[in-house]
Every structure is written in C-alpha cells, then in structure tokens.
UniProtKB/Swiss-Prot annotation:
Its cofactor is Zn(2+). One of its GO terms (biological process) is peptidoglycan metabolic process. This is Penicillin-insensitive murein endopeptidase. Dimer. The lineage of its organism: Bacteria, Pseudomonadati, Pseudomonadota, Gammaproteobacteria, Enterobacterales. One of its GO terms (cellular component) is outer membrane-bounded periplasmic space. The keyword Membrane does not apply. It comes from Escherichia coli (strain K12).
Length: 274
C-alpha cells in the first residue's frame, strides 16, 4: 500500500473517531426538574442549567464549544468558588469544559463529564482578565516537569495551592483529579490541615487543570455515585506508585466498547434526536 493510501486511511479513521455523537445534536437543555442520571462516564442530565458567561469572578473558555452546561449544583459551586477566590484577591477563575446541554458522551477529550457534575478549571489565576481571543484559544500552563516527577518550582504559586484546597473543602465536591506531581506538591505544602487532601486524586495528564467532580444530588435518584476515596490523605504508598516505572510486560488496556446507556438516557435520546 502506498503512502498516499495509508495517509488517506489514517485521515478517515481520525475523522470517524471525531464524528459527532448523538448527544451533540441536542443543542438546548432538556426541560424538567434537574436530574443527573447514570454514572459520570455513562449518563445524561435533564434540566441542566447554563453557566452565565458573564461574571466578575470567573471567565469561561472556549464558549464556541458550548460545553458550559451542568446541574444547578455545579453552577452554584462554580459561582461559590470563584466568589471566594475573588474575595481573597487571588485572581480570576478560568472555567473549562463542563458538559453538553443534555450531558452524554463527547466525541473526544472526555470519558466523563456526562451527568452535569464535572468541571475542568485551569490552574492559573490571572490578575488581568483574558481577552476574547485568549478565551477562545486558551494557552494552558503546564505546571509539571518533563520527567513528570515534580512541579516546576518557578510556576507553582501559593494561590494555586489555595485554589485546589478551597475547591476540595467545598461540601458538594467528592473528588478532584490532578497530575500525581501536583498531588505530591500539595502533600508537601499542606502542613497539619490535611483532611481535604483525601478528595484530591492523582490521575493521568491533568498537568495544567484540575477536574472537579461533585457528589450525586440527593434528589437525583438515578445518579450513580462513586465509592468514597480511601481514608487518609493519599500521600503515601499509593501516590508514590504513580512515579514507579511500569512493570515488565505491562500493556495498555484495550479500548472497551461503551456500555449500554441507562434506560432513561436512551429514552431521552430517542425522544430528542431524530
């Protein structure tokens, strides 16, 4: 097979992988009382709220992607956190992806963010508000060294520590995903007040942002919560295991076929997508 044919096949495969999912055809929230349905990586939402684009405390990035929808609890969390940050004079909170109008699967970039309870927040707090052009094409600030073993000391700021801690202390937050090197730095900086560290979980990538996840709302009866994180601050052997080389013979897990949708989410698709 010649190179042109190989390139064409690669392009077609790439295009297929980025093909729009049915959820992207739903352009407005589904009317009804707010209900997060299913799990974070296989679910949907009825009655999502739209995060107001204009705020003196935060700015929303990539608004052209229209990923600023979520459960009312998520919208209130963002407003609550950004107000705290502003009152402390720390800067402007930069909001990344939340979810789509009815939640559901993205065509790439996220496995979760499906039930309106997840949000990505940049780990930088500009003192000067970003321009429209900067918000549409945001420049992420990679806080982790090339070898992945520690944060870049010249980029790590006390304000970023405080931002993550404030988010983790929020009553509605159940998990915050950050790079292992960032978790390690939080462990070093935390001092004796360490209870909140339990919620901060090391995960792949997440070098420039934190992924905040809320607990299932009490009245979302079909929402599936994760088990609570292990007890303790998570700064011991589990964290160190992230820095160890992979064991010989370790291979990447095969990509799994997505599980069936929860019945309520399938019914929502059947009703709202032609």
């Amino acid at each position: 097979m010649n190179k042109t044919a190989i390139a064409l096949l690669a392009l077609l495969a790439s295009s297929a992988s980025l093909a729009a999912t049915p959820w992207q055809k739903i352009t407005q929230p589904v009317p009804g009382s707010a209900q997060s349905i299913g799990s974070f990586s296989n679910g949907c939402i009825v009655g999502a709220d739209t995060l107001p684009i204009q705020s003196e405390h935060y700015q929303v990035m990539r608004t052209d992607q229209r990923r600023y929808f979520g459960h009312p609890d998520l919208v209130m969390f963002i407003q609550r956190l950004s107000s705290q940050v502003s009152n402390l004079g720390m800067g402007t909170v930069l909001i990344g992806d939340m979810g789509m109008p009815a939640g559901g699967r993205f065509n790439g970039g996220h496995a979760s963010h499906q039930t309106g309870l997840d949000v990505d927040i940049f780990l930088q707090l500009p003192k000067t508000r970003w321009t429209s052009a900067q918000l549409l094409r945001p420049q992420a600030l990679d806080l982790v060294s090339r070898d992945g073993k520690h944060v870049v000391s010249t980029l790590w700021k006390p304000e970023i520590f405080s931002l993550i801690k404030l988010a983790a202390q929020d009553k509605d937050v159940t998990r915050i995903f950050v790079n292992p090197a960032i978790k390690q730095q939080l462990c070093l900086d935390a001092g004796t007040d360490r209870d909140w560290l339990r919620k901060v979980r090391p995960w792949f990538q997440h070098r420039a942002h934190m992924h905040v996840r809320l607990r299932c709302p009490a009245d979302s009866l079909e929402c599936e919560d994760q088990p609570l994180p292990p007890s303790g601050d998570g700064c011991g052997a589990e964290l160190q295991s992230w820095f160890e080389p992979p064991k010989p013979g370790t291979t990447k897990p095969e990509k799994k076929t997505p599980p069936p949708l929860p019945p309520s989410c399938q019914a929502l698709l059947d009703e709202h997508v032609i």
